[in-house]
Regions:
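Bacterial N-terminal signal peptides that target proteins for export
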Residues: 1-8
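Bacterial N-terminal signal peptides
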Residues: 9-16
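Sec/Tat signal peptide C-region and signal peptidase I cleavage site
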Residues: 18-22
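Active-site catalytic motif of lipid deacylating hydrolases and related acyltransferases
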Residues: 23-98
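Serine-dependent carboxylesterase/thioesterase catalytic core
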Residues: 27, 79-185
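Catalytic metal-binding/acid-base residues of hydrolase active sites
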Residues: 33, 106, 137-139, 205-208, ...
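Short aromatic-enriched loop/helix-cap "lid" or pocket-rim segments at secondary-structure transitions
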Residues: 41-42, 143-149, 154, 211-218
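C-terminal catalytic-base region of ester-bond hydrolases, centering on the histidine
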Residues: 192-288
């Protein structure tokens, strides 16, 4: 009898260990507005990507997405491209769990997939594997700066590096347009059904651009200065591109920058860079 009990215990332990071993987690980094062909270097940069990779048991289970996010979020070159790359990633790496980290408008494209499972036959499997989306500075309720670009005012040329020039993704991020999309096509905002997986916002609250402030230099001083200028056309709480109310409009707020960065703020450029411990925050969350 004792032998049988021992055998059963060993069998249970073996099953438990093999089950735990079989759980494979992957992380996908999804860029914001722009037509990316090398987002690793051009959008995120190596320090950010490799810092996030540190959270994975298998460091090969990381995907840096490259798609044309100058298009409307539902376009085959935007959500269709993203769905294709995520599907291939899940299949080739044999993933059980998928964590997606988005920046800016990338959160809208991901939210389109999560909100519209019947739009594309690939969406349901992605949603099934999706554990959570960590949305860095998402433009969930749009930005007045998109309205400014479409209106063709004097700031259009100054915003080109940040947003683009009158493309469909910029049109989509106008405040009124995003309000309509949120009411009719997207889940996760106030008064709408919840998203099928956690959508957690990281909110940038300010811009520091002082010449003698070390905070201003992370991610590039000139970018910080540019965001300080654009912040003048936004509410008092913004990262220079996205107002806090927009960044926190969908899902739930994971944290506001200063709560986890030792008091440093994350402007809209810094929230995609290895600034103020952000890669470690994300990596530790993946491990958790």
């Amino acid at each position: 009898m004792q032998r049988i009990k021992r055998a059963l215990s060993l069998l249970s332990l073996t099953v438990a260990c093999s089950t735990a071993h079989a759980t494979v987690t992957g992380v996908a980094l999804v860029h914001g507005t722009g037509n990316q062909t090398n987002a690793y270097s051009d959008y995120w940069q190596a320090d950010m990507v490799e810092g996030v990779r540190n959270g994975l048991t298998d460091r090969n289970n990381l995907l840096v997405v490259n798609c044309d996010f100058t298009q409307y979020m539902w376009d085959s070159r935007a959500a269709g491209c993203l769905a294709g790359q995520l599907t291939s990633f899940i299949q080739t790496r044999h993933l059980d769990r998928l964590i997606v980290i988005t920046h800016s408008n990338g959160g809208n494209v991901m939210r389109w997939i999560m909100s519209n499972p019947t739009w594309d036959a690939r969406y349901p499997a992605i949603i099934q594997h999706l554990v959570k989306v960590d949305a860095l500075a998402p433009s969930s309720a749009g930005t007045p700066l998109a309205d400014a670009v479409i209106a063709g005012n004097v700031f259009e040329s100054a915003l080109g590096w940040l947003l683009g020039y009158k493309n469909d993704a910029v049109r989509q991020q106008q405040v009124g347009w995003m309000a309509t999309y949120n009411q009719q096509y997207l889940l996760g905002t106030a008064g709408r059904p919840a998203l099928p997986a956690a959508f957690r916002d990281v909110v940038g609250t300010d811009v520091v651009s002082g010449l003698f402030s070390s905070q201003a230099y992370c991610g590039g001083y000139t970018n910080s200065v540019g965001l300080e200028i654009t912040q003048n056309w936004l509410s008092s709480c913004s990262d220079g591109f996205i107002e806090c109310s927009s960044a926190s409009a969908a899902g739930t707020v994971w944290f506001r920058d200063t709560q986890k960065t030792g008091g440093s703020v994350l402007n809209h450029n810094q929230s995609r860079r290895a600034c103020f411990g952000l890669p470690s925050i994300l990596a530790n969350d993946i491990k958790g």
